[in-house]
Design a protein with these regions (language model features):
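Bacterial N-terminal signal peptides that target proteins for export
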Residues: 1-7
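Mid-length scaffold segments of soluble, non-membrane domains
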Residues: 79-143
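Bacterial signal peptide processing site
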Residues: 18-20
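N-terminal secretory signal peptides
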Residues: 30, 35-103
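C-terminal motif of bacterial Sec signal peptides marking the signal peptidase cleavage site
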Residues: 14-16
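Extended, aromatic/histidine-rich regions of cofactor-dependent oxidoreductases associated
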Residues: 138-140, 157, 165-200
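Acidic, glycine-rich flexible loop segments
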Residues: 130-166
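Terminal leader/tail segments of proteins
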Residues: 84-88, 153, 184
Length: 200
């Protein structure tokens, strides 16, 4: 949906990991390998990062990998006939028509939290698009928020893994059109996991 380019394979691999609990024996190495692969992909000629900006952004900046930020979640899916259509504002002021697929509920830092999951109207991918902001937004992380892509689970077992949170393309290149997280996805905790802003 919002991946594109050769980064698609990297993010799909990470999203697939988000539908099952992490195996701590290889969890950290799996995340580290995916991050290295993304850095390599972003050095290609056809990525959002312009050649002149690659030294500024690469390698990408991350919080340390922390399995505590990979939390089990329940997913309440809205029936297709009852799915709300939402006009999501974007970085280029061209609203996106999104469909609210359902809600992920989980406990983190002792708080019960919820995130709405979406996909773009007409999109047939088997992933949940979860844009969010948190108490690090505009400080250690991109002020406009970060994204998660979570694979749909046939078993109903979901893991929200914030170690896989990534910046939208408009962070690297303002010509890209990126949806802004809705108000309902503003988390009241600091998500010190996933991608940061350069130099933080």
């Amino acid at each position: 949906m919002f991946r594109g380019f050769v980064l698609g394979a990297v993010l799909l691999l990470m999203a697939a990991c988000s539908s099952r609990p992490p195996d701590e024996s290889n969890y950290v190495s799996t995340i580290a390998e995916a991050r290295a692969a993304k850095d390599s992909a972003l050095r290609a000629a056809t990525t959002p990062i312009l050649a002149a900006d690659r030294d500024k952004f690469l390698p990408l900046a991350y919080f340390p990998i922390d399995p505590a930020f990979a939390v089990p979640a329940s997913f309440t899916e809205n029936p297709p006939a009852a799915r709300q259509r939402v006009e999501m504002q974007t970085s280029t002021h061209q609203p996106r028509q999104m469909e609210r697929i359902g809600t992920l509920a989980f406990t983190l830092q002792g708080k019960l939290l919820r995130l709405a999951a979406y996909h773009e109207v007409g999109d047939s991918s088997d992933h949940l698009f979860v844009p969010f902001t948190d108490l690090t937004s505009g400080k250690e992380t991109y002020q406009a928020g970060r994204y998660l892509d979570i694979a749909r689970s046939p078993t109903g077992v979901y893991v929200v893994d914030f170690n896989e949170a990534y910046n939208p393309y408009c962070y690297y290149n303002p010509t890209y059109d990126c949806p802004y997280p809705p108000k309902e996805n503003r988390l009241s905790v600091a998500i010190t996991a996933g991608e940061k802003t350069a130099g933080k």
